[in-house]
Swiss-Prot record:
Protein name: UDP-N-acetylglucosamine--N-acetylmuramyl-(pentapeptide) pyrophosphoryl-undecaprenol N-acetylglucosamine transferase
Keyword annotations: Cell cycle, Cell division, Cell inner membrane, Cell membrane, Cell shape, Cell wall biogenesis/degradation, Glycosyltransferase, Membrane, Peptidoglycan synthesis, Transferase
Enzyme class, UniProt record, top EC level: transferase
Coiled-coil stretches: none
Keyword Transmembrane helix: no
Amino acid sequence: MTSTPRTLMVMAGGTGGHVFPGLAVAHRMQAQGWRVVWLGNPAGMEATLVPKHGIPMEYVRFGGLRGKGLATKLALPFNLLRACAQSLRALRRVKPDVVLGMGGYITFPAGLVTVLTGRPLVLHEQNSIAGLTNKVLAKLAKRVLVAFPGALPNAEWTGNPIRAELARTEPPQARYAARSGKLKLLVVGGSLGAAALNEVVPRALALLAPSERPQVVHQAGAKHIDVLKENYEAAGLACGSDVELVPFIDDMASAYASADLVICRSGAMTVAEIAAVGVAALFVPFPHAVDDHQTTNAEFLAEQGAAVLVQQRDLSAELLADWLRGQSRESLAAMAERSRSLAKPDATDEVARVCAAVAGANLEGKQ
């Protein structure tokens, strides 16, 4: 007679920073025979992305107030009650053994209803500064997990769940030692393109002598790739063997592992992935992030000499060119090793184990 599998409900939505770590845990639990159901917003990216991973969805409509008008704020009580009712119906249908909240607006009403109906709630905060939802729910959850130490009081530091292939990358010492010739630079703008990086990096490279100039792979998002090409051409740098411009990178593990240096924003998942792989990084935090959390994310590595932090207001072609002139593969390798030493490569397993334990089960092995 086959026993009924235990069920995990993942609550996450809105941005990749919430959704991708949730997917990492979901796949880990599925590999152990668990049934996984996702609770998200039908208007969020999760509604398109999660079903592609073979995970069924339940939906709750709820949004935030930040930057919204008076009408939205006045409608909050009604919208919250509606979201709570939708959450209650979803929980009754799914009957989860444990609920994992990974962030996003829907986590607030769904988390409240989870607790009020007596189901165990596990929370995970991805950023170095916790959002309001997790600050409230942390007082009600069975277990509270954080990616950065100190993000929430009395929480367990697990790190951020990442894709398995990133955690399995060859150690930086071996990778850097096997290379010779020009430095290899990876610039990651993400889907939004990071216009500041697209403008400054080509001009900085143009200030370097050809012998000093690294080989570059610059990712900028499909909407920005034409402008990026124009920026490189205006700087006198034609695309070719030493300059590759791409709209998207499918295999980030290989891209990180092939680079001596990464220049990028400092979202929570980016910082976690760079540390897990062990690669030198120059972080330029997005200046308009909520609570300036990208700065504190980057500081976690930068304060340990495991990365360099430059605020966007301070970034210039001259500053970047001068800094690049002072780097060697040896200095970048040392930075990469410090970064790897601060990583939590088993974060996915740890979060999954906590979920299983709260449900009264065990999780076997590692991913």
